[in-house]
Curated annotation (Swiss-Prot):
Protein name, UniProt field: Cytochrome P450 monooxygenase aflN
Organismal lineage: Eukaryota, Fungi, Dikarya, Ascomycota, Pezizomycotina
Organism: Aspergillus parasiticus (strain ATCC 56775 / NRRL 5862 / SRRC 143 / SU-1)
Family designation: Belongs to the cytochrome P450 family.
Gene assigned in the entry: aflN
EC category: oxidoreductase
Coiled-coil stretches: none
Cross-referenced SUPFAM superfamilies: Cytochrome P450
GO terms under biological process: aflatoxin biosynthetic process
Binding site for heme: 421
Ranges annotated as spanning the membrane: none
Record EC number: 1.14.-.-
Pathway: Mycotoxin biosynthesis; aflatoxin biosynthesis
Cofactor(s) this protein cannot do without: heme
Amino acid sequence: MPEFSLLAGHFGTLKKTIQGMPSDATLHSIMLKISQQFSSGIFYINMWPFSGTWMVVSTPSAASQIQKLNLTKPVILRRPLETVTGGPSMMSMHGETWKKWRALFNPGFNPGYIIGLAPNITDEVATFWLSCAKGQQGEVFPLESLTTRLTVDSICSVVLDTQLHHQIKDHPLATALQRQIDWTTFGTTFNPLKRYLTIRPLVLWYNNKVMDRIIGGEVDRACRTPPDHPSKSVISLALREYLQEQASTNSTRSLAEFKRLVAPQLRVFLFAGRNTTSSTLIYSYYLLAQHPEVLAKIRAEHEDVLGADPAEAQGRIKEDVQLLNKLPYTTAVIKETLRLFPPSASMREGRPDAEIIGEDGQRYPTVGCNVWTLTVALHHNSDYWDQVENFIPERWLVGPEDPLYPVKGAWRAFEFGPRSCIGQTLAMLELRIALAMTIRQFDITPAYDEWDSIHPATTAKEVNGHRAYQAERGAGGAHTADGFPCRVKERC
């Protein structure tokens, strides 16, 4: 446990750590720095006056124990999550209710099913490609403005079978969701105005009305789809599963009730997937630009599998989506990117009968604590990763005899077990397609030096040696600092 004050708790430790970091560094990054003081990989920290006591863990063993204890999400997460999603969703549900909804959507996110929707994603990436081509006219611009729109369009295309065209023009659904996120605090901000500003309820009410209207219309459209021409979208598959379940149990639940209950699930797919996939794509470009030898290898793999002409990649994928399963080095690049820059973590609520046993045999009670598996600390723990700070995609391709081989349970970008991220297959698919359709067409390089000359900083602007550090910008998400200012140049 960090040094404790009877008057201020651990606030002094937090303040001291924050002072040496950028003002918008994520709480994950702050806790990573604190966690490096504790070799056991488990410590307690009192978050007064913002929260209670947290147990922070960064070992595979402790993370696995937390997963198996089946702890619930704490109130400090459930409330803001349900504010964003408009009600209980798979992210905040527990027990039998969660099992029901997870079972309903599992078939739609099955790897064998989701890869069949790859052509939808290629169409959205083609629009992203055109946006990059426009951006390569010499100006420095924040790439996040494009990647977030790409992920929103891709998710809606796959889940709802609808094209928002948010990459071309602001769409009301995406705009309302962004406003909802911006006006929701996840307890990671220390700004009291952002926490307690009284106009918030009115803004949230309006956003909910907009999103419910649009999502309700899409569910109605799925209901009207002719049975002989069924849509392949995730929502259509879930609707068919729901109707079959109702018929088999003689239930009288109406479609109106399904529409009301399913809306938060659809919102959570957008909320959970938009920033995480967007930031991972950006960090892939960032790391590839820093490691030309890795960039050469991934481009060579794409040429071998998708053909010599990069412009034909989309057509090749549409003709044979299974080609995407023949890109092991690309997958390794993505997994290594997620190791160095995991976009999220996992927090649960402790209980009296739940203890975590450390690797030294010491018992750590969880009662009265929010138990946080700090993924970024686990991924940067040198006890479990050889050359921990180096970007080495090959570690995902070697055998168990190699020192680089990952320790079981040490990589938790999507968590493990029944409550692992349901959208991980979609995220990995979208990332493979985006890299396959862009990395040979463009050189995407960070332009922080130019950006900083125009926007001089008064505080530190690096975390762990990276100018492209993970930054806080609403809803506890880990964004790329300053939206990743870059230059895009089309390759000859």
